[in-house]
Amino acid sequence: DEVRMAMNVPMIDMRSAEYPKLTLPIFEDLKKVFKMKDGRVFIFPSSGTGAWESAIQNTLKPGDKVLMSRFGQFSLLWVDMAERLGLKVELCDEEWGTGVPLEKYADILAKDKAHEIKAVFATHNETATGVTSDIAGVRKALDAAKHPALLFVDSVSGVGSLDMRMGEWGVDCCVSGSCPSSWPILWSPGSCSG
């Protein structure tokens, strides 16, 4: 009853002076969840799919080459979206239930001496198959190749239930969602750089 009664308050208008007082502390608290010190958190009023689209459209442009893998339903949807938005996808098509192919990513990035690949995409937790991918391993592949590509992570069903170390792992943009892992939909750091 105590929790129910605490929620029994009038709605706050999002344009009122009270609204920022309520929401601004959330941004700093969410940085702790993502284990990040730098960068920005954006609370985005959409599904995880809407946040993916916004992240892609605000950081990349049609014709940009990206490295992606497909190994489950949500990585499949992310690849489809990238292609619909005009990105040139270098695809590692993997058996469902396997995760991000780190060795293939490392090989492709090492061979990309001209740095044509602008972003590397990794699905952190593939809900459809229950597979968790090694995001730190993707960063190691980028670093070993001395590759400047941005690292995008789909963690819609991961953040809040799996470890996410944006700062330590050098994640440039992470999309999470409220439903699968109980956190607000957001996107974060460095996603507007480069």
Please annotate each region the language model reported:
Residues 1-44, 49:
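A glycine-/small-polar-enriched, mobile loop at the entrance of the PLP active site in fold-type I
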